[in-house]
From Swiss-Prot:
Quaternary structure and interacting proteins, as annotated: Homodimer.
Protein name: Histidine--tRNA ligase
ATP-binding listed as a keyword: yes
Pfam families: HGTP_anticodon, tRNA-synt_His
Assigned keywords, A-Z: Aminoacyl-tRNA synthetase, ATP-binding, Cytoplasm, Ligase, Nucleotide-binding, Protein biosynthesis
Similarity section: Belongs to the class-II aminoacyl-tRNA synthetase family.
Encoding gene (name): hisS
GO molecular function, one term: catalytic activity, acting on a protein
GO BP annotation list: histidyl-tRNA aminoacylation
EC number, UniProt record: 6.1.1.21
Annotated compartments: Cytoplasm
Reactions this protein catalyses: tRNA(His) + L-histidine + ATP = L-histidyl-tRNA(His) + AMP + diphosphate + H(+)
Length: 426
């Protein structure tokens, strides 16, 4: 048997992982500006954490979960999304306690798992960046969450970004709309796809975001949820729209957008961008005021979003955004002869201790091959260390870009390479 990675997974090699790290660090800096701290939850959870919160009838639970029974006969699932584990952690760690500063603002990054057809930008193991805010029912929190995502996209260089917005209202408004939608779709049931016929019984709002052509045709004349918002829900949505306009964040209302998870209420949103003529969703989120109580905590409002890291990297690549990734070595030490081996190791360790990125030859190659390695590593400076240099205690340090050279003592390098680095123009 040929040993290969499982279908729908990927190996992220060093050259590629540098881009991942850049995007992750960029997100961390953005979150820090908004006073968010990082939370890390287990990669696997009890099955009920996901099934009860995400919704027993969602595609995630019915078709896509990686779940199994462990050796203690506990029903376990690999996490398919980030919000439910964070809410579980919020409740379990009593972050709702009065001594904890509110609102509680956290972000996460990590692997998620869904058994679905692998496609560009979405694999069975995929990586998500997300943020969650607990404890504020102020519509300004929703807008801040949207503004944070918008700032991230703008600052990192993603263009043609559009914001789609909708409201699912409070539970009363949602229930009224649910019934209106059932009344509208029931006479059309025979024309719906098999999945949507099932959803009509279990979760009719999901019919609205079906991608099947027959479902799209059926919902064209569907009632708008905005017509079923009560006074409280209408006022909340109006406040969100007003504050977005104040911040000059353009948006489009999409009344057919309902989100694939059952726990949302009031504001929901998606950011999309255009890649090769098609629209790609790069961020999605919304408000979920009932989820903390559902996990056994007190009534606590919440709002959050998630972004797929693979999809972000795909968009950055397709839109031609050059990420300023520093991969160049500061110093490469070419080693000539066995007598220089130990001294070369001592030298690179001293350089690293001073904060320089340093590498040396370990393969006892000819100088020409070592110089080629220095070029491949984009080394800024080059030191050649042979037996004669070890004996004399003096070496030549070369600017590997313009070939300028200076001769210095090994002691000078070990004590303060920064001075030499600057003399060579760096």
């Amino acid at each position: 048997m040929k040993l290969q990675k499982p279908k729908g997974t990927q190996d992220i090699l060093p050259q590629e992982s540098a881009k991942w790290q850049y995007v992750e660090d960029f997100a961390r800096k953005t979150f820090r500006k908004y006073n968010y701290g990082e939370i890390r939850t287990p990669i696997f959870e009890h099955y009920e954490v996901i099934s009860r919160s995400v919704g027993d009838t969602t595609d995630i639970v019915t078709k896509e979960m990686y779940d199994f029974y462990d050796k203690g006969d506990r029903h376990i699932t690999l996490r398919p999304e980030g919000t439910a584990p964070v809410v579980r952690s919020y409740v379990e760690n009593k972050l709702f306690a009065p001594e904890v500063q509110k609102p509680v603002k956290v972000y996460y990054m990590g692997s998620m798992f869904r058994y679905e057809r692998p496609q560009a930008g979405r694999l069975r193991e995929f990586h998500q960046i997300g943020a969650e805010c607990f404890g504020s029912s102020n519509p300004a929190t929703d807008v801040e969450m949207i503004a944070m995502a918008a700032q991230f996209f703008k600052d990192i260089g993603i263009t043609n970004v559009s914001l789609e917005l909708n409201s699912l209202g409070n539970p009363e408004s949602r229930a009224a709309y649910r019934q209106a939608l059932i009344d509208y779709l029931t006479p059309l049931k025979a024309s719906l796809s098999a999945d949507s016929q099932r959803r009509l019984e279990e979760n009719p709002l999901r019919v609205l975001d079906s991608k099947e052509p027959e479902d799209k045709a059926a919902v064209e004349g569907a009632p708008s949820i905005l017509d079923y918002l009560d006074e409280e829900s209408s006022a909340y949505f109006a406040a969100v729209r007003s504050m977005l306009e104040t911040l000059q964040i353009p948006y489009v209302i999409n009344t057919n957008m309902v989100r694939g998870l059952d726990y949302y209420n009031h504001t929901i949103f998606e950011f999309t961008t255009e890649v090769a003529g098609s629209q790609l969703t790069i961020c999605a989120g919304g408000r979920y005021d009932g989820l903390v109580a559902y996990f056994g905590g007190p009534e606590t409002p919440g709002v959050g979003f998630g972004m797929g890291l693979e999809r972000l990297l795909l968009v950055l690549d397709k839109q031609g955004v050059e990420l300023p990734i520093e991969t160049a070595l500061d110093v490469y030490v070419a080693v000539l002869g066995a007598d220089a081996n130990g001294r070369a190791l001592e030298l690179v360790q001293a350089l690293r201790a001073q904060g320089f990125a340093a590498e040396r030859d370990y393969l006892d190659r000819k100088l020409k091959a070592q110089f080629k390695s220095a070029d491949n590593f984009k080394a800024k400076t080059l030191i050649t260390l042979g037996e004669s240099e070890v004996e004399s205690g003096r070496v030549t340090v070369k600017n590997n870009h313009n070939r300028e050279e200076i001769t210095v003592s090994l002691d000078q390098i070990q004590e303060n390479y920064q001075l030499i680095f600057e003399k060579l123009g760096f």
